[in-house]
Amino acid sequence: MEDSRLLITLILVFGVIFLKKFFQSNQHPSAQRLSATGVNAHGRPQGSTQNALRRTGRVNGGHPVTTQMVETVQNLAPNLHPEQIRYSLENTGSVEETVERYLRGDEFSFPPGFEPSRAPMGANAAVDNNAAGGGEFNDPRKKNMICAENLLDKFHVDLNEDMSNLSFKDLDIEERKRLLVWQARKNLETKLQSDKDLQSLLT
């Protein structure tokens, strides 16, 4: 009799655990954190946050924006001014769309009548602004990272040295780099001798 009661109790306990697991939300942890802050997975306010926004309303008629929405975007785009983020969120109504715009490299404008040079900024934005010398904000995605580099100097390749008899498989990584640069330069020299159009471009 006691064995059957124990068996029924165990079945009930495992049944409850199984049902809990089965009906548990299979959201990603970041989506669960967003729902806890009052923003849904699409970046729109929900629950008590949405009710509070409905009560307060927006003066300019745009989408309602919470400070959590602005902070979420600011964490991903620290070089944007909070007013740029707020204005974009008022237009799109979604954190997700605003972040996608940022990742695409779209321009973020300030609200009409807003003076960016007089606005309070975070420490990072102030440093960037001072470095730029004024009201322009630096965008690290728009820096030109391409610069001409002389590979002969970089890998210490001597063109007078004859490397044609070296075996590629026997060399270490640095020597292979030197050999590849040397071969590319020699191939260019031979091509320049035969191709008059290419020669005219370089002279």
Swiss-Prot record:
Domain CUE stretches: 65-107
GO molecular function, one term: ubiquitin-protein transferase activator activity
Gene name in the database record: CUE1
Sequence ranges on the Lumenal membrane side: 1-6
Database matches in Pfam families: CUE (PF02845), Cue1_U7BR (PF18499)
Annotated segments matching region Disordered: 36-61
Family, similarity comment: Belongs to the CUE1 family.
GO cellular component: CUE1-UBC7 ubiquitin-conjugating enzyme complex; Doa10p ubiquitin ligase complex; endoplasmic reticulum; endoplasmic reticulum membrane; Hrd1p ubiquitin ligase ERAD-L complex; mitochondrion
Name of the protein in question: Coupling of ubiquitin conjugation to ER degradation protein 1
Biological process according to GO: ERAD pathway; establishment of protein localization to endoplasmic reticulum membrane
Subunit structure as annotated in this protein's UniProt entry: Forms a heterodimer with UBC7. Interacts with SSM4/DOA10 and UBX2/SEL1.
TM regions (residue ranges): 7-23
Other remarks on this protein: Present with 589 molecules/cell in log phase SD medium.
Role this protein plays: Component of the endoplasmic reticulum-associated protein degradation (ERAD) pathway. Recruits the soluble ubiquitin-conjugating enzyme UBC7 to the cytoplasmic face of the endoplasmic reticulum membrane where it functions in degradation of misfolded or regulated proteins localized in the endoplasmic reticulum (ER) lumen or membrane via the ubiquitin-proteasome system.
Gene3D superfamilies named among the record's database cross-references: 1.10.287.4310, DNA helicase RuvA subunit, C-terminal domain (1.10.8.10)
PROSITE patterns: CUE
Cytoplasmic side stretches: 24-203
Species assigned in the record: Saccharomyces cerevisiae (strain ATCC 204508 / S288c) (Baker's yeast)
Membrane topology designation: Single-pass membrane protein
Annotated compartments: Endoplasmic reticulum membrane
InterPro entries in the record: CUE (IPR003892), Cue1_U7BR (IPR041158)
